[in-house]
From Swiss-Prot:
The gene is mraY. It is a multi-pass membrane protein. GO terms for biological process: cell division; cell wall organization; peptidoglycan biosynthetic process; regulation of cell shape. InterPro entries: Glycosyl_transferase_4 (IPR000715), PNAcMuramoyl-5peptid_Trfase (IPR003524), PNAcMuramoyl-5peptid_Trfase_CS (IPR018480). This is Phospho-N-acetylmuramoyl-pentapeptide-transferase. CDD domains: GT_MraY. Its EC number is 2.7.8.13. The keyword NAD does not apply. It comes from Mycobacterium avium (strain 104).
């Protein structure tokens, strides 16, 4: 538990202190946000707000993770793991893709960055590399960072993917989550606050997996996850970094995370869900993100097939704004829905464990 607290504290401190420095730097450089021309009228006032704040989030996560392991040397903590590094590397590569996207938007003075092909290639390349490496790095107990078995709370042994299909599955998971968080990041603090809750839920889940690992505590209900404690540290560092960033990103935002942050955070959910064997449970925990990206897909498909729109604007948080809800009202209500979803997800996880031990 000490590792978890240290990760949160370091990540939060780095993020909350680095963000205002980035605000000053990006303001001097003219790295301002460009709003959608067809967006809600109230959003035009946000034009010029510094973007690319995701740099502070990524830096905070890495600082929290590495700082925790350095501190761990003092009380004989577990070392850096393949699972932790894979998740963080995936998030960082996606963050670089997002950074390039943000930079191009700024240079062009338009809300159009990397073209869809280039952005997709970057996401797919990151996912393929992650998927290939996740089936390697077998430890002394024969466990790899990921399992080719499809997983809900633990592996579903009846659904095993061939290596090639598993890599393809990773492409779908990584692309879906990175785009889902990206679409959610349209209101001040919405994505950062929601991510803090989802990763906090993952701290509880992965730490419970660590306390009930088959390697150290064999028996009914144990978990075959390679590095659950390290995943808990990654999740804790992410929650801390998001909270620190939220201090400056809450309405009215002084800075936006941009695609730099949203793509990286989507990579965190994708990476942790795969390495903790909870890909299906993640859909419950991150149901707000799922709903946001689904609203975009539904809007596009419906308009192309019928010529009509389901929502006044997608992602659907804009629909509620145009329906008359204040931005802060949408944010707080969506945070409440995320908290409920996370509570439900943790309850399902714990309930499955109780069922497994016959309680």
């Amino acid at each position: 538990m000490r590792q978890i607290l240290i990760a949160v504290a370091i990540a939060l401190t780095v993020s909350i202190l680095l963000t205002p420095a980035l605000i000053r730097l990006f303001t001097r450089q003219g790295f301002g946000h460009h709003t959608r021309e067809d967006g809600p009228p109230t959003h035009h006032a946000k034009r010029g707000t510094p973007s690319m704040g995701g740099v502070a989030i990524i830096a905070g996560i890495w600082a929290g993770y590495l700082g925790t392991h350095l501190a761990g040397l003092a009380f004989d903590g577990e070392g850096i793991s393949a699972s932790g590094l894979l998740v963080l590397s995936l998030a960082t590569v996606l963050g670089i893709v997002g950074f390039l996207d943000d930079l191009i938007k700024i240079r062009r003075s338009r809300n159009l960055g990397l073209n869809k092909t280039a952005k997709t290639i970057g996401q797919v390349a990151a996912a393929v590399l992650f998927g290939v490496l996740a089936l390697g790095f077998r430890n002394a107990n024969g466990l790899t960072p990921a399992s080719a078995d499809l997983s809900y709370v633990r592996e579903i042994a009846t659904v095993t993917l061939a290596p090639g299909l598993f890599v393809l599955f990773c492409v779908v998971v990584v692309s879906a989550w990175s785009n889902a968080v990206n679409f959610t990041d349209g209101l001040d603090g919405l994505a950062a606050g929601s991510m803090a809750m989802v990763t906090a839920a993952y701290v509880l889940i992965t730490f419970w997996q660590y306390r009930n690992a088959c390697v150290t505590a064999p028996g009914l209900g144990c978990y075959n996850v390679r590095d659950p404690l390290d995943l808990a540290i990654v999740a804790a560092a992410t929650a801390g970094a998001c909270i620190g960033f939220l201090w400056w990103n809450a309405a009215p935002a002084k800075i936006f995370m941009g695609d730099t942050g949203s793509l990286a955070l989507g990579g965190i959910i994708a990476g942790i869900s795969v390495t903790s064997r909870t890909e299906i449970l993640a859909v419950v925990l991150g149901s707000l993100f799922v709903a946001e990206v689904s609203s975009v897909v539904l809007q596009i498909l419906t308009f192309r097939t019928t010529g009509r729109r389901v929502f006044r604007m997608a992602p659907f948080h804009h629909h509620f704004e145009l329906a008359g809800w204040a931005e802060t009202t949408v944010i707080i209500r969506f945070w409440l829905l995320t908290a409920i979803a996370c509570g439900l997800g943790v309850a399902l996880f714990y309930g499955e464990w109780l069922a497994a031990i016959g309680a």
